[in-house]
């Protein structure tokens, strides 16, 4: 579903540059004149190149390296060949990656769907994720470790200009709990396997055939519990054999990462700024309650 126009006024200025780059890439790819309709504003921007059946995924060229984007497309093609419920790279034209006006862009088949809204939707998403995990076996290697997420957080926290709106005391709080949680994780033996890497419900669409997972740029190797930790607790039962204590630990680490990333990107939109504030408050509440027990 495209974002309503009234939400676009709060979006940071570079969005217009991204949309212009998407139009240029669409023309270069042979799609003719298109009108990008915003589907998702996150750390990447996803647009439908209307009226074509193609979507574009856009990020800053400094974020999306050629090698990383090519790996994402390669993994996506592997998943498509296995019949996995995932988005597919454009096949009638070159999927890219393209680099235009400081933006890195890949092209995908457009999927019309809606976000999960009910407990039943969550279960369907979890079951589809199981199929993705099965199809990821034999995915092109090497894949990065899931710990690159933690490294990214540490770099942002140690470089205040990357998250300048974050209060210094809050920065110390996040650095402290990030260090403590990573130390706890280092004491555990982990069974590693290929994962989606960012399996929260914002990265899945419900379509008529079923749930479809997207945003495959964080595919990695890690414990199954890393993907499960992205899901609501009621979905954990769909993954028998997981260690719930490990899921809870990784859920806490993931919340730290999401909080840091939101603060680093808090000028992207009012939604991102609100999410940054909300995630930080949830972490403070969570760790305050742990200290009092």
Please provide the spans of the model-predicted regions.
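A glycine-centered beta->alpha junction motif in the catalytic cores
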Residues: 60-61, 104-118, 153-165, 256-274
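A cross-family kinase active-site recognition segment
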Residues: 112-170, 192
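A conserved alpha-helical element in kinase catalytic cores
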Residues: 16-19, 58-101, 117-132
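ATP-binding glycine-rich phosphate-binding loop
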Residues: 29-50
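Juxta-kinase regulatory segment immediately upstream of eukaryotic protein kinase catalytic domains
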Residues: 1-33
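Active-site Asp-x-Gly
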Residues: 193-194, 206-251
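Catalytic-loop of the protein kinase fold
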Residues: 194-196, 201
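Helix-rich C-terminal or lid/interface subdomains of diverse kinases
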Residues: 241-293
């Amino acid at each position: 579903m495209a974002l309503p126009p009234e939400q676009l006024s709060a979006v940071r200025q570079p969005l217009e540059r991204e949309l212009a780059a998407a139009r240029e890439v669409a023309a270069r790819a042979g799609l003719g004149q298109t009108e990008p309709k915003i589907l998702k504003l996150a750390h990447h921007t996803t647009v439908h190149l209307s009226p074509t059946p193609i979507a574009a995924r856009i990020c800053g060229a400094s974020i999306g390296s050629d090698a990383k984007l090519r790996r994402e497309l390669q993994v996506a093609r592997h998943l498509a060949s296995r019949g996995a419920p995932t988005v597919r790279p454009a096949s009638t034209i070159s999927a890219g990656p393209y680099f235009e006006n400081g933006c890195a862009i890949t092209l995908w088949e457009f999927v019309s769907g809606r976000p999960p809204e009910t407990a039943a939707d969550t279960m369907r998403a979890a079951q589809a994720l199981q199929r993705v995990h099965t199809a990821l076996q034999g995915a092109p290697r090497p894949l990065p470790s899931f710990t690159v997420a933690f490294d990214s957080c540490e770099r942002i926290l140690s470089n205040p200009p990357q998250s300048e709106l974050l209060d210094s005391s809050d920065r110390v709080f996040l650095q402290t709990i990030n260090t403590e949680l990573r130390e706890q994780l280092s004491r555990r033996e982990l069974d590693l396997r290929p994962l989606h890497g960012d399996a929260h419900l914002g990265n899945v669409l419900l379509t008529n055939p079923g749930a479809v997972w997207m945003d495959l740029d964080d595919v990695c190797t890690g414990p199954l519990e890393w993907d499960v930790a992205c899901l609501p607790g009621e979905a954990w039962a769909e993954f028998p054999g997981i260690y719930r204590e490990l899921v809870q630990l990784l859920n806490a680490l993931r919340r730290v990462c999401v909080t840091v990333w939101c603060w680093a990107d808090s000028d992207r939109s009012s939604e991102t700024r609100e999410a940054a504030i909300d995630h930080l408050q949830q972490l403070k509440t969570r760790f305050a309650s742990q200290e009092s027990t």
